[in-house]
Amino acid sequence: MAALRQIAFYGKGGIGKSTTSQNTLAALVDLGQKILIVGCDPKADSTRLILNAKAQDTVLHLAATEGSVEDLELEDVLKVGYRGIKCVESGGPEPGVGCAGRGVITSINFLEENGAYNDVDYVSYDVLGDVVCGGFAMPIRENKAQEIYIVMSGEMMALYAANNIAKGILKYAHAGGVRLGGLICNERQTDRELDLAEALAARLNSKLIHFVPRDNIVQHAELRKMTVIQYAPNSKQAGEYRALAEKIHANSGRGTVPTPITMEELEDMLLDFGIMKSDEQMLAELHAKEAKVIAPH
């Protein structure tokens, strides 16, 4: 059996990270791979489309119900979904109470100790990426995930989050084997989005793994709690996710140590692409507008 590949999908909240990861993993299982998904997002929506169900009970919730994690059995937390994909959600505390990242640490330790990683080709971590705090960096920090895929778009905050995640990877890259596998651009139809995604990937010493076009069929499938792979296997969008899965499958050992850029460099890049205006331009436009308003008729 080939060595276990541990991958992680990071990305800012609302970028479509969980949808992208579940569709990609559904395509990957169709390539004959055995997969375990470990959801590391407090929303616990990392496995919904694979299980065709509402968010599953999380490790933290079940541990609180039973008394502690030690009182749980693997079958209590692990559910099996589309084509045998194993699913676990780590969960998080009530909003404003405690560190959500602790659920990630607790879950991964529990799963390893109870043999969840046996007999799978891939373990995939789906991780919140607005903040790369200690808990959420756990799959990186503890050298669990070896390949990180950042889901982003051409929007300013998605680019900012992608660069921040690259900083987190760099911090642990030399201590362990973690590498940036590449960027996945989830199209938001912003100006020059593909060019910008490729430029950022190059600046980060990485590559754009795939550009996922926007398609309403993704929402249609989600409303039915399904991946596009399951809902419309012959659709163009299903083909996009299969292409992405094949690229990830062929990307083993090809990750890089990222070279994150400064906020100033990121803003300069946006200026170069005409996405952002300089302070001087904005002031000139504002003054021109004000002059127009107060000009006598």
UniProtKB/Swiss-Prot annotation:
Its EC number is 1.18.6.1. The modification ADP-ribosylarginine is found at R102. It holds the Pfam family Fer4_NifH. [4Fe-4S] cluster binds at C99, C133. It catalyses: N2 + 8 reduced [2Fe-2S]-[ferredoxin] + 16 ATP + 16 H2O = H2 + 8 oxidized [2Fe-2S]-[ferredoxin] + 2 NH4(+) + 16 ADP + 16 phosphate + 6 H(+). Its cofactor is [4Fe-4S] cluster. Keywords: 4Fe-4S, ADP-ribosylation, ATP-binding, Iron, Iron-sulfur, Metal-binding, Nitrogen fixation, Nucleotide-binding, Oxidoreductase, Plasmid. Binds 1 [4Fe-4S] cluster per dimer. Gene3D superfamilies: P-loop containing nucleotide triphosphate hydrolases (3.40.50.300). The reversible ADP-ribosylation of Arg-102 inactivates the nitrogenase reductase and regulates nitrogenase activity. ATP binds at G11, K12, G13, G14, I15, G16, K17, S18. GO terms for biological process: nitrogen fixation. The keyword rRNA-binding does not apply. GO terms for molecular function: 4 iron, 4 sulfur cluster binding; ATP binding; metal ion binding; nitrogenase activity. Belongs to the NifH/BchL/ChlL family. The key enzymatic reactions in nitrogen fixation are catalyzed by the nitrogenase complex, which has 2 components: the iron protein and the molybdenum-iron protein. PANTHER family: LIGHT-INDEPENDENT PROTOCHLOROPHYLLIDE REDUCTASE IRON-SULFUR ATP-BINDING PROTEIN. Homodimer. This is Nitrogenase iron protein. It comes from Rhizobium meliloti (strain 1021) (Ensifer meliloti). The lineage of its organism: Bacteria, Pseudomonadati, Pseudomonadota, Alphaproteobacteria, Hyphomicrobiales.
